[in-house]
Amino acid sequence: GNTSFSYEHSGSHFACTSSSAAFPASVVGTIYRGCRTFAFKTRCSGDRTCRVGFSFVPILARQEEYSAHPSFSSLFIEADYDSTERILHFKRRGGGFPYCAIALSDTDILPQFTACKDHIYAHSVKEMSDVFPLKIRSEGIGATINPLCAILTPERKGGEFVFLVTCGGSKKECTEQLLRARRKRFTRQHTAPPCPEADEMLAKMLFSRPSEGLSDVDSSCLWRLSLSGTVPLAVMEVYEETSAISRALRAFLRLKTAFVKTELLFLVHEKEKYSSPLRAFIVEQTESEYAPFMHRAGGIAVADADSFSAEELAFLKRYAFDYSESDSIEIPGAALPLYVPPKIMGYEPKTVAAEVKNGFSYDASGVVSDEIKEHYMPYSYVMAGYAAGTVVTHKTLGFVFWRNARECRVTSFDGNPYAAYYGIRIVAGIAGRFFDLAAFSEKTVFEGGKSVYSGSIAGHGYELKVYARTKLPAVEYRLKFDGISPTCMLIKEQSADMTADNKGGVWLFSDMRHRAVPFVGFMKCSEKCETVNDSALLFCGVDAQRRDILAFSCTTDEVSFAIGGAPGREAALRVASLCCRGDTSGEAEAFVKKHIPGYRLQSGNAGLDALFSHFAPYQTAISRFFGKTGFYQTGGAFGFRDQLQDCFCLVYSSPETVRVHILRCCAHQYREGDVMHWWFRAPQGDTGIRTKCSDDFLYLPWAVADYIEKTGDADILNVRIGYMESLPPESGERYETPARSESRESVYMHCIRALANGEKTGSHGLSLMGSCDWNDGMSRIGSGGRGESVFTSWLYVLVCREFLPVMKLMEDYRSIAHFTAVSAGLVLALERNAFDGDRYIRAYDDAGRVIGGRNSPECSVDILGQAFAAMTLGRTERTVSGLDTAYRALFDRKAKLFRLFDPPFDRYDAGY
């Protein structure tokens, strides 16, 4: 039935009320100042019996740090349930962060709760009960990984419960504050009195704003009054001392306290010019609570009407959203409308008879998502060309990037796998309803560098095809309907720190914040369309000047859209002019085919065949090498080790790509033999970090040896490349834009320098670990310069063995003898100092303590030490024992996953 919602607040209290015959209810909130606790009281009217769910996501970190990578930040949240006091606690590992705790005021209530949102995915939640757990949890939860505080009460007549939330410096402090809060009585405070003037002003602001723009000439009349001209302006002409002035001031203050930006200008018509009684009257009205807002941007100004020219007064009348006179202000008696965005139809669950655990099917060329089945997590798909790409899921259009998926996101990004994120939407309007065509799709196919969403609305089928252009920095979207021409819309979110304008039917936009790589984004539509930047105007036809979206809207049965980026405005317009010229998805298919090896695995296991024949090569080429991004993390940079690892796969399908990348990596090596751990292209030059990592540089000689073995192209060894130049870092790493050397050396010498740089060993004769090895998360184990890595030691021996044929090819017998001896010494040290009963250990830290041994309380077994021992030595008694130990300890049969190591680090600070 019809439901209306109201919200009131005053000081430290608020109230939300639902007025519905079906379910009238309210939530009242307050702060218990004596114990620094938030209290939320719920109740439903009448004799209804109900349960109440209360949930939030604990962050416990500074917003900017959390926002930089929410999923990574969430890994460090832990939960603990005190069953005696019935309090749920949250903390962030590492110290220096606040604690958080939640409880019910009534200790007789035994609630259900969860501290983790692993079971929640936006497109699988059909009702609120899906958010809450099925049983009461016991204490001792530990790491949450994906934290969520969700509490569900038992049924109670009247639905009256009080939830208490507090923060403190320790678990003990939180407990004490909640215990004090439980002794308090919840009393609803009086909320602020109604303010119909503020309601009227808000309604005019949302619905009555004119289209008058603000030029520099126009704005000068506001700037001289210290008004900004960038927020909505209300103007009142004052002819006499009247209560209308105080009502206007009260409306202004109410909007300010509700965080609604506005400016207020009083134009005074003085009859007595010398004494100015009207100005004095207004100043007297504003001496107290309004004083902080006087004559400043976003505030209140008083000016003589005679000081404005006739043209300026005419401009103010056109520009102001509310222009009134002090003797003619009206107070409406009827309720005023507020803009409520229409519901955009998305996921609608279907009922199936058979039990289904997975909603995806696979074959040798792609993935099919069938919406008749359940999905417990999003399935993501990366599409990329040489200059741009996109990450989508089976229910959303994700985000678009230009060149660098981290630094140059054309549309907004959210890596939260549990949310329904819509940075871009393609929406169809049919019979007054709006449908998100990705979220509403009944079938999604990821195949050959394309995503195809299909379904039907009101009996009319549709198909939405998405792909990245191979050479153009753009992503295209082709939409086709059968037998109907709906309103088709491409909608992009627009934040407050973005600027945008329309140039010949093309949206151009850029980020006003400082960016390491500045760029201009663009959006284009193939058809004649309306360009809109206001969601209220797009959906309701009312220009509220919200400036919250960029959108195209057209009525057609077939349309193409494009989104992309370029270094500047003119370049963006040139690229846009080349987009939306027909179906060019064939070039995306050809690009993918070029980078997928022609071999096919035939093992008798269809899933395994699909993995090795298509999925792994596709992920390697498109997601890792060209896109350098995924759903969870958008790196955007070249990783020295990362993309060289990918070359071991790419060499089978695109050896020329591998050749170019080997030369690129040589150009990012220092003369000392170490390398830039990662870097990205910036206007001032390639920028990244120089580290003391122990293994990344070893992938250069390994990849070169593999490339020559697979292609026979030994000429690459004679190509001369320069080095990066800077002082070696004193500590673990340094972020820099280094210079380039004038001198050059052959690729072969680059490889020799890499091997020579890896010769350094510690007290046990093993390779020094430095600031990390393959596992970047172990960055503190050897940061003091004494820790040793068993993994890097095995890797060094393996690389020397693989590079030996290249040294023979170059007839470099001195290097052959030297590195053979170094390798033999490492193997001897490994067998003497790195085998612990039934496993190879992982490392020695700076203090000489064993990591990955039988007696290690954390990380007692690590897969890398066993795997690389077997890869290097083959089948020996010790390698078989190590692999068996790792299999028993690390393989999770239920999840069918291998842990990297176990138990996880909890007390020992391994780094990262």
Where are each of the predicted segments found?
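Catalytic cores of carbohydrate-active enzymes
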Residues: 676-677, 795-910
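Aromatic-rich carbohydrate-recognition surfaces in CAZymes
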Residues: 255, 647-658, 662-765, 790-797, ...
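Aromatic-lined, polymer-binding surfaces characteristic
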Residues: 199, 229-232, 589-614, 618-627, ...
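Long, charged, mostly alpha-helical binding arms that flank functional sites
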Residues: 26, 150, 202, 539-542, ...
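Secondary-structure capping and boundary motifs in well-ordered enzyme cores
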Residues: 226-230, 244-247, 471, 635-642, ...
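Carbohydrate-binding/catalytic loop surfaces
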Residues: 632-636, 676-695, 723-742, 768-787, ...
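Inter-helical turn/loop segments and adjacent helix faces that build the functional surface
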Residues: 171-172, 710-719, 738-739, 802-819
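Anionic coordination/interaction segments
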Residues: 1-641, 656, 661-664, 706-711, ...
